[in-house]
């Protein structure tokens, strides 16, 4: 039997190892957007969420990538070759949209849109049942570039550590999969990234 802990940050992973955990059973990738030091990656995530087209989304994902890769890399490093199950982003996107006027203004300026357009885009994200809405695997299907970026961050982090002779054992969890076709779609993206 293997007993694992959960972790939300590299520091959590180190603490889990100190406690004797035999791996991380759930590393929620989106928790890098909460807490200390999260302001810049959260801002890039917000840019990605509010992007109006593929080019805007790709630019935001490219800005977000180094933050995500670093968090994953340091978590894998902390676990010293023990398994780390990394769950791809799961929460509904509207949870990450700023609610205070100062942050809304900053985001609108970065996107080169006015406050009304930001509000329109934000309203379009609201759902009547967020638990069953546009999140998890469904987000990855409608925007495969989001899954691709996360998979690339995980795999590059592991490869960089391997080149430093640090053993890693990353595992990828695809959240909220309800049908085989959903799983197959996301699995193909991850495997394509792995061989590229």
Residue ranges and their predicted role:
Residues 4-196:
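Conserved alpha/beta-domain cores
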């Amino acid at each position: 039997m293997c007993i694992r802990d959960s972790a939300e940050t590299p520091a959590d992973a180190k603490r889990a190892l100190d406690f004797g955990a035999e791996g991380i059973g759930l590393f929620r990738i989106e928790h890098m957007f909460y807490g200390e030091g999260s302001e810049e990656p959260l801002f890039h995530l917000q840019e990605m969420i509010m992007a109006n087209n593929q080019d805007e989304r790709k630019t935001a994902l490219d800005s977000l990538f180094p933050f995500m890769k670093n968090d994953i890399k340091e978590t894998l490093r902390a676990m010293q070759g023990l398994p780390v199950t990394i769950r791809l982003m799961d929460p509904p996107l509207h949870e990450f949209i700023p609610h205070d006027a100062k942050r809304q203004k900053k985001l609108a300026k970065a996107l080169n849109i006015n406050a009304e357009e930001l509000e329109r885009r934000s309203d379009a994200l609201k759902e009547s049942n967020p638990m069953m809405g546009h999140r998890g695997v469904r987000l990855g299907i409608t925007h495969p570039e989001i899954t691709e970026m996360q998979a690339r961050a995980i795999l590059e982090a592991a490869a960089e550590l391997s080149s430093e002779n640090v053993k890693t054992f990353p595992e990828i969890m695809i959240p909220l999969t309800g049908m085989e076709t959903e799983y197959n779609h996301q699995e193909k993206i991850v495997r394509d990234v792995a061989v590229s």
